[in-house]
């Protein structure tokens, strides 16, 4: 075998051993594409460490808005049959490294008359300078006591970005213009917290006054005087080198 080919194979084996020793046996055999992927991961980790203190934008969470003046704390308990009580650690299947499904959530039948619910998911630890919206869902019937993946199947989308989903809920705006953004915190940025806020409304939202894809701020203003309670479920997820 020519010396050049032998040297090239030896270099590939060295790279392969280096990558495997750092990332573990799950990492694929070294190649130009895998080495480039590894370099990009290192750059992501470095940037995340530089931005590590950019987190904790809890003041920007939806329930910190003026509409919650009478109810600064949750009034009912939300839990997840799949993941457990609030504060759970999300499995990989709930992230962008897995199927990216939303956790199944449940809450008790309300003791007061709820016209409808508004559901918002957000991450206050994203290094964006504000809480990052992952999902907004309007017009959830007041007799509902659960929410999950089956509600969010995308059936279609028009030219204005209006999405039709299996539940019939109106989908609000997130930064990717999708039905839901599954967790994918930057590698090296540590655990991120994900807040799922279930807001009970004493009056229904007026669809004539909502934009086709309502924003968090738009809804925050619209529900002033309509909040009659709310529940909160949180979870954490951290991206690992081995993912």
From Swiss-Prot:
InterPro entries in the record: PEBP, PEBP-like_sf, PhiB
Biotech exploitation of the protein: Phomoidrides A and B (also known as CP-225,917 and CP-263,114) are potent inhibitors of Ras farnesyltransferase and squalene synthase. CP-225,917 and CP-263,114 inhibit Ras farnesyl transferase from rat brain with IC(50) values of 6 uM and 20 uoM, respectively. CP-225,917 inhibits squalene synthase with an IC(50) value of 43 uM and CP-263,114 with an IC(50) of 160 uM.
CDD domains linked to this entry: PEBP
Domain of life the protein comes from: Eukaryota
Xref: SUPFAM superfamilies: PEBP-like
Family: Belongs to the tstB family.
Physiological role: Phosphatidylethanolamine-binding protein; part of the gene cluster that mediates the biosynthesis of the antihypercholesterolemic agents phomoidrides which are dimeric anhydrides. Within the pathway, tstB is not essential for dimerization and its function has still to be determined. The pathway begins with the highly reducing polyketide synthase tstA that catalyzes the formation of a C12-fatty acyl-ACP, starting from one acetate and 5 malonate units. The hydrolase tstM is involved in the release of the C12-fatty acyl chain from phiA.
Stated name of the protein: Phomoidride biosynthesis cluster protein B
Species this protein is from: Talaromyces stipitatus (strain ATCC 10500 / CBS 375.48 / QM 6759 / NRRL 1006)
């Amino acid at each position: 075998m020519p010396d050049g080919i032998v040297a090239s194979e030896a270099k590939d084996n060295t790279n392969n051993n280096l990558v495997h020793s750092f990332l573990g046996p799950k990492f694929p055999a070294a190649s130009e594409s895998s080495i480039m992927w590894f370099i990009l991961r290192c750059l992501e980790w470095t940037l995340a460490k530089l931005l590590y203190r950019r987190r904790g934008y809890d003041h920007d969470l939806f329930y910190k808005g003026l509409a919650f003046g009478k109810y600064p704390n949750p009034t009912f308990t939300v839990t997840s049959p799949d993941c457990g009580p609030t504060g759970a650690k999300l499995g990989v299947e709930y992230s962008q490294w897995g199927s990216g499904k939303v956790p199944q959530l449940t809450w008790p039948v309300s003791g007061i008359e709820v016209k409808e619910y508004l559901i918002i998911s957000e991450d206050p630890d994203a290094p964006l300078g504000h809480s990052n919206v992952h999902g907004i869902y309007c017009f959830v019937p007041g007799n509902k006591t659960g929410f999950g993946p089956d509600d969010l199947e995308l059936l279609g989308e028009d030219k204005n970005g209006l999405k039709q989903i299996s539940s019939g809920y109106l989908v609000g705006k997130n930064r990717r213009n999708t039905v839901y953004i599954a967790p994918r915190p930057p590698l090296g940025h540590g655990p991120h917290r994900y807040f799922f806020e279930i807001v009970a409304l004493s009056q229904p939202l007026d669809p004539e006054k909502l934009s086709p894809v309502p924003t968090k701020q738009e809804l925050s203003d619209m529900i002033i005087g309509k909040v009659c309670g709310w529940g909160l479920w949180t979870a954490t997820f951290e991206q690992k080198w081995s993912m």
